[in-house]
Design a protein with these regions (language model features):
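Active-site neighborhoods and metal-handling regions in enzymes and metal-associated proteins
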Residues: 1-405
Length: 405
């Protein structure tokens, strides 16, 4: 048997080197990092592992698995892939490999359960565990050329689905649910692989959000600006079968495209009628979002501080009098205007206050200025960008206008 795909060993070595670099800078006392999140194990090994990955500051990494050993050996270039049942076996495994058994260890604390954390501390009592979340986030924020190639392809297909395919499949009179089905069909036909992964504890996402008319301001429980009814209180995703997209109403579609474990984020606003019928308030609000989106893209350069970019956006909004609906209406309002994206949709850094670490070349962020209009809905723009010295380069196309159908 052969693997469907494998990461080059040089790609993994590059990622390991970046993790070690940020561990050394942020946590000089640690002797390595234990990663238990399956998504991060995939990022560090090329295999969506059920177990634990040990990356020492010096020496050979080890992938320890409860299940899937044969598959891991097909998929991952990691040389040491071993079976294990419990974290308590880690010292013996490392000692048998001739490695130093660590006493200070970084852990991906933000991505594991309380029970998993307790298992570490109770079975490895001699070890001191510290959070390596920030070092891991910084390491994965700067994308490799391999990652960028995957994200570009995802972005191209994302744009094609919303701009070319969906426009031929939807029309006023359809329910949000039927529109969501059309969007899903378009994206899946273009290679979307279904799974969407979130970094925030307990957060879930399936496809994204479809909100017709004032659904765009419906109370939301997720950390995003777009309101939506969703399919049901138990599944607050996609769109509601009972909400119909009416003529001369806006429709906002905020979706994620996933390809080979990497995500792009894009929002497209449609209008159920001719452009001359778009209400002036919606036009003006959307133009404001386009101006912010364009300014952010121009300034998405190495050295720029996310907190300062966010502050400037707030100034632009306040000067035009849109502060009450910017990034959500009422309690839907969120305190950011963009976010990192890659193996997670909601990754570091956020374009928000207190995020003062300067951007670096080849970071990838979604920029999403949006404005809610009482009684009408939400408008705005979102694309996924690569940080370059010339400014942000869109990976999800250049379309920003409201598409009138």
């Amino acid at each position: 048997m052969e693997a469907i795909d494998t990461l080059p060993s040089t790609e993994l070595e590059n990622r390991w080197a970046r993790v070690r670099k940020y561990l050394a800078a942020d946590l000089p006392a640690v002797q390595g990092v234990m990663v238990m999140s399956r998504t991060l194990i995939f990022w560090l090994t090329g295999h969506w592992g059920n177990g634990l990955f040990w990356l020492p500051m010096e020496g050979e990494p080890v992938l320890m698995l409860r299940k899937g050993l044969e598959r891991a050996k097909l998929e991952s270039p990691v040389e040491s892939i071993l079976p294990f049942r419990s974290p308590g076996q880690v010292p013996k495994i490392l000692a048998e490999m001739g490695q130093v058994v660590p006493t200070v260890v970084g852990v991906d604390m933000g991505n594991i359960s309380w029970a998993a954390g307790q298992a570490l501390t109770s079975r490895l009592e001699h070890m001191q565990f510290v959070s390596a979340d920030q070092a891991l986030a910084r390491a994965r924020a700067v994308k490799t050329q391999w990652e960028l190639a995957t994200l570009r392809l995802a972005g191209e297909r994302h744009s094609q689905s919303l701009i070319e395919k969906v426009t031929e499949m939807i029309e006023p009179g359809m329910s949000e649910r039927d529109i969501a089905k059309a969007v899903w069909t378009a994206m899946y036909d273009l290679g979307h692989q279904g799974q969407i992964r979130m970094n925030g504890p307990g957060e879930e996402l399936y496809l994204g959000v479809v909100a017709a008319g004032d659904s765009g301001n419906y109370p939301t429980v997720t950390n995003g600006p777009v309101g939506y009814r969703g399919a049901h209180p138990g599944v607050p995703q996609m769109g509601y079968a009972g909400q119909i997209w009416q003529k001369n109403q806006p429709l906002i579609v905020d979706t994620v495209f996933q390809l080979e474990g990497y995500h792009t984020d894009k929002t497209q606003v449609y209008f159920g009628g001719q452009s001359r019928n778009v209400p002036e308030e919606l036009k003006n609000a959307h133009t404001m979002c386009q101006e912010i989106h364009s300014w952010l893209a121009d300034n998405l350069r190495p050295g720029a501080k996310p907190s300062e970019l966010y502050s400037q956006c707030l100034d632009m909004v306040q000067k035009q009098g849109w502060e009450n609906g910017f990034m959500g209406l009422g309690q839907n309002q969120v305190p950011f205007v963009g976010h990192g994206i890659g193996i997670y949709v909601d990754d570091w850094p956020a374009l928000a206050a207190k995020f003062d670490t300067p951007l670096e070349e080849d970071m990838v962020l979604a920029l999403e200025p949006k404005i809610g209009i009482p009684g009408q809905g939400m408008v705005g723009v979102e694309n996924t960008f690569q940080v370059t010295s010339q400014g942000g380069v869109s990976l999800t196309g250049e379309a920003e206008d409201i598409l009138c159908l």
